[in-house]
């Protein structure tokens, strides 16, 4: 919650735009700050005015907007900000913050929980330009990504993201998720190099020790790994059958199979061909003697009571032994 000294410090380091927290819900206005709505409104407008006087562009963070009185507080406040922007000639951004993740994307949902209603309302009842609107979501109810996409679709020009979705409580909107949402909506990547997503995930994991859950889309260890033999058989015939897209080209992550008791000869064959591809060797048919030797060894492990998956190191060793025996 900024004051004049904060703005002076921000300006001194060369920053031209800064965020100003302007909590909107009665939970914050009454219970946290102990103010009336009018007192809160006057206080916020004074802070934004100080920000503009300091030569900075304000970005107003409408905290807890999905629990706020939309027509009783949010719209009147946004109207005053747009008047201030017009009078000063300084653009004022509004960040709609779904602080507790209560927002929903469903058409016809009631305000203040309706994401589309919030974005539509700020544009049509307060005259906030699309380029001055952004969405800030949380994932408490697993709606982080879909709510952010809904905000885009209804006119917010930007959505706030974090790398790997790391953030308060259950996390924020993952940057990598919105990259692919953008591509699916626009039909192109607009020059983005999506392989960097894998590099970012590797960097964060190695440098911070953060363990990425293996099932995490796009960045988890197992996001494009299949364990079922019937799936592996499909992958042998055509990657598109069981791979979400060309993960090798877009993420530098070729599809993988995990060999276990249900992988079947197709799963073993797929693993061997991935190994051979890395070594610059030609692929082999799943009915080849090489695949049969390794498959028989795998089955022997489970016939003897093994319950864990076969590791890549074990499969590498058995594949090399089988190739030497040919």
Tell me what each language-model feature is.
Residues 1:
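Glycan-recognition patch characteristic of GH18 chitinases/ENGases
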Residues 34-35, 134-135, 165, 255-256:
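Short, contiguous strand/loop micro-motifs
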Residues 14, 18, 22, 26, ...:
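Structural signal for hydrophobic packing residues in well-ordered secondary-structure cores
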Residues 100-244:
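Catalytic alpha/beta core domains of metabolic enzymes, predominantly
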Residues 17-19, 59-61, 93-95, 134-136, ...:
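Structured core elements
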Residues 4-129, 149, 153-154:
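Alpha/beta enzyme core
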Residues 187-326:
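A mid-to-C-terminal "edge-of-domain" accessory segment
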Residues 6, 39-43, 47, 61, ...:
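General structural feature for long, well-ordered alpha-helical segments within catalytic domains
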């Amino acid at each position: 919650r900024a004051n004049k000294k904060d703005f002076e410090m921000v300006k001194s380091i060369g920053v031209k735009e800064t965020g100003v927290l302007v909590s909107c819900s009665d939970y914050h206005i009454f219970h946290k700050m102990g103010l009336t709505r009018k007192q809160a409104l006057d206080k916020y407008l004074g802070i934004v005015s100080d920000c503009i006087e300091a030569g900075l562009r304000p970005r107003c963070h409408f905290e807890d907007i999905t629990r706020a009185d939309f027509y009783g507080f949010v719209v009147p406040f946004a109207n005053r900000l747009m008047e201030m922007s017009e009078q000063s000639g300084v653009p004022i951004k509004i960040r709609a913050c779904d602080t507790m993740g209560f927002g929903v994307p469903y058409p016809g949902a009631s305000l203040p929980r309706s994401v589309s209603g919030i974005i539509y309302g700020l544009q049509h009842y307060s005259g906030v330009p699309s380029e001055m609107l952004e969405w800030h979501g949380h994932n408490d109810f697993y709606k982080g990504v879909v709510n952010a996409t809904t905000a885009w679709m209804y006119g917010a020009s930007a959505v706030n993201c974090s790398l790997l979705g790391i953030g308060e409580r259950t996390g924020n909107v993952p940057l990598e998720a919105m990259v692919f949402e953008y591509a699916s909506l626009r039909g192109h990547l607009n020059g983005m190099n999506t392989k960097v997503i894998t590099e970012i995930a590797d960097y964060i994991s190695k440098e911070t020790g953060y363990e990425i859950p293996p099932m995490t889309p796009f960045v988890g260890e197992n996001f494009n790994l299949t364990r079922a033999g019937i799936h592996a058989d499909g992958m042998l015939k055509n990657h598109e059958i069981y791979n979400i897209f060309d993960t090798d080209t877009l993420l530098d992550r070729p599809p993988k199979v995990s060999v276990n008791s249900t992988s079947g000869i197709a799963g073993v064959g797929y693993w061997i061909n991935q190994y051979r591809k890395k070594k610059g060797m030609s692929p082999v048919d799943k009915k080849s003697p090489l695949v049969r030797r390794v498959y028989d060894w795998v089955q022997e492990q489970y016939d003897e009571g093994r319950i864990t998956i076969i590791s890549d190191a074990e499969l590498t060793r058995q594949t090399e032994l089988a190739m030497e025996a040919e």
